[in-house]
Design a protein with these regions (language model features):
Chain A
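Residues forming anionic-ligand binding surfaces in small-molecule and nucleic-acid pockets
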Residues: 106-113
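Active-site loop segments of alpha/beta catalytic cores
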Residues: 1-39, 43, 56, 67, ...
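Short, structured active-site "lid" loops
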Residues: 44-55, 62-64
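Glycine-rich, N-terminal phosphate-binding loop and its surrounding beta-alpha-beta segment
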Residues: 56-87
Length: 357, 213
């Protein structure tokens, strides 16, 4: 029996108070594609039209029962606002085409100086996101909205020709313009985050997608990742808004840097992390979320039945819920390979197994 | 004299000094040293050192990719002077599957295979299934190597295998798969021949098929 609104539930869990049940907080990304198709839209339409995007995002709560709204539902907003161009050409099933960067804003180091921090009320698709957040806030004041900003290195990969490969090589060369570019991307995310908060977002969520354990060392993480996320965290923290951090792949080698250096309000764990280890080691110091498998070849959310999803979610809940400070979540984004009934199974599991006495 | 150059070019690749690696390759040619010998004694051992450092976590992707750039700077200069050998130790068709644009892992496999005498036909990333099928029919590779980093695009890998069967090409090529979400289980499920966790696994596999030099 629900006795709290999604907002009350989510905040209670985040702040280690006792919620009525474990909240289900999801990073919806290409997983909304099922609904985009049902509404007979293309990705290009839905990402560029506020009314269409609103219709799709609204379903995250009304259809699937998540305790939050999550948007943008793609990763390219900052890159596009900084001047990169998208083409809708990446096939992702059902004849749908996602946007990918086809022309990068930064080709040479000197290009960095030519780019200004974009105005979120005007640049690229940022105004679309802000408009949808305002509408969601007005219609669903009791459902928290997580505004998503790209991790600064991920935005660099969207604006720098050569993508991550070039970023990695320039890091190894110790090219100073990479820090200039990271700073520009950080300030862009801060401006966007502040605008989303003003529009009604109650939290800012982020992902570090390319700086993963198999790619970079803890020292590189400390230099190229931590200080930039910390700036975003501090800027929104000054407004009283929590920073929700997801590290793709195995966060284990970086956890101390994340918890002590970035100091987010919550870390959402990827499939690769042992949730029990995370809860025991960090669960009193920081709120955690996770991590029903969604991104490995045996991922239950993608390939399992709803019953199997519920069983996996039950295991996570049993680890996470004692002492509060826990959101039930998928191990990564909800992508288009996840069947809708499996998303609903997560919510059903929280209602069945996640009730606090 | 040659030994000194091999050592210097080796060092240049290991530390990722692109300009120096290129300069030494040109100097080697100017000194009339056989380009294949420079490759075998200078470049290939260098990438072995880099790979070892990566395994020991002394190097991570940034250093490894920088060394790869230095390798290619020298290798491309030398390759232009090598006697044309169309198949090397074996021909490998390699690419990232349709729907995925992450190609760093694929590139690392390619460099190690090329450094060890395999000829790679690089299909790039986000490659339509039909393009793989056409290319397999056209160039008759010994191996097809498919990569994906993302879970949703694992389906493209499966469909590429299905396409090979439908077109009657499956028994003409050995298929290896790899990438973040891929596993042996998945490899078996889709009917591929081999799964590798990294570039060394890939090299071991193709060498086990063609026989070591």
């Amino acid at each position: 029996m629900s006795t709290m609104t999604p907002l009350e539930r989510t905040v209670a869990a985040l702040t280690f108070k006792k919620p009525d049940r474990v909240p289900v907080i999801l990073y919806f990304q290409s997983g909304v594609q099922h609904d985009v198709q049902e509404l007979d839209y293309t990705w290009e339409e839905v990402l560029n039209h506020p009314r269409k995007l609103f219709q799709v995002v609204e379903l995250q709560h009304t259809k699937y029962g998540a305790d939050n709204f999550f948007l943008p539902v793609d990763f390219r907003v900052e890159g596009e606002a900084l001047g990169s161009k998208l083409d809708y050409m990446l096939k992702c099933g059902g004849g749908m085409r996602m946007g990918v960067v086809s022309d990068w804003a930064v080709k040479t180091p000197s290009d960095v100086k030519k780019i200004c921090i974009p105005d979120p009320t005007k640049a690229g698709r940022m105004p679309v996101i802000l408009d949808v957040i305002r509408k969601l806030k007005k219609k669903y004041p009791d459902v928290p909205i997580a505004g998503f900003v790209n991790g600064p290195p991920d935005t660099v990969a969207d604006v720098l020709e050569g993508r991550y490969k070039r970023l990695y090589v320039e890091m190894a060369k110790k090219s100073s313009f990479i820090h200039d570019l990271l700073e520009l991307c950080t300030q862009t995310s801060i401006a966007f985050a502040k605008a989303m908060i003003e529009a009604g977002a109650g939290a800012i969520a982020t992902v570090e997608g390319g700086m993963v354990d198999e790619a970079v060392s803890p020292d590189q993480y400390a230099e190229f990742v931590v200080p930039y996320h910390r700036k975003i965290r501090d800027a929104i923290g000054a407004l009283g808004v929590p920073y929700i951090y997801h590290q793709c792949e195995n966060a284990t080698p970086f956890m101390d840097l994340i918890v002590d250096g970035i100091q987010p309000a919550l870390v959402a764990f990827h499939d690769s992390v042992d949730l029990k280890w995370a809860k025991e080691k960090y669960g009193k110091k920081i709120a955690i979320a996770g991590n029903v498998s969604v991104s490995k070849s045996d991922a239950v959310l993608m390939f399992g039945t709803p019953e199997e999803v519920m069983a996996a979610a039950k295991k996570c809940i049993e680890i996470g819920m004692p002492g509060s400070g826990y959101w039930l979540s998928a191990g990564c984004e909800i992508h288009h390979g996840v069947p809708p009934e499996n998303i609903k199974a997560l919510v059903k599991a929280a209602a069945l197994y996640g009730v606090y006495k | 004299m040659s030994e000194k150059l091999f050592k210097e070019i080796n060092d240049a690749v290991v530390v990722g000094d692109i300009d120096e690696a290129g300069r030494l390759a040109r100097q080697g040619l100017a000194d009339n040293i056989d380009p294949m010998t420079i490759t075998e004694k200078g470049l290939i051992p260098a990438m072995a050192i880099v790979s070892e450092k990566y395994d020991k976590k002394e190097y991570y992707l940034p250093q490894m990719l920088l060394s790869s750039e230095a390798f290619y700077e020298a290798f491309n200069i030398l390759k232009a002077k090598l006697k044309v050998e169309t198949t090397g130790r074996g021909k490998v068709l390699i690419g990232v599957v349709e729907g995925d644009v992450h190609d760093i892992g694929k590139n690392l496999v390619k460099i190690v295979l090329e450094a060890n005498g395999f000829v790679c036909v690089d299909m790039g990333r986000d490659v339509p299934i039909e393009d793989y099928l056409e290319k397999v029919a056209e160039v008759h590779p010994d191996f097809l190597m498919l990569s994906t980093l993302m879970t949703p695009t694992m389906l493209s890998m499966k469909r590429t295998l299905e396409g090979l069967v439908e077109e009657g090409l499956r028994d003409k090529v050995k298929v290896g798969v790899g990438g973040g979400p891929i596993s042996w289980d998945f490899c078996k499920k889709i009917g591929a021949d081999f799964y590798g966790d990294n570039e060394k696994d890939a090299l071991k596999w193709v060498e086990s098929i063609v026989g070591k030099k």
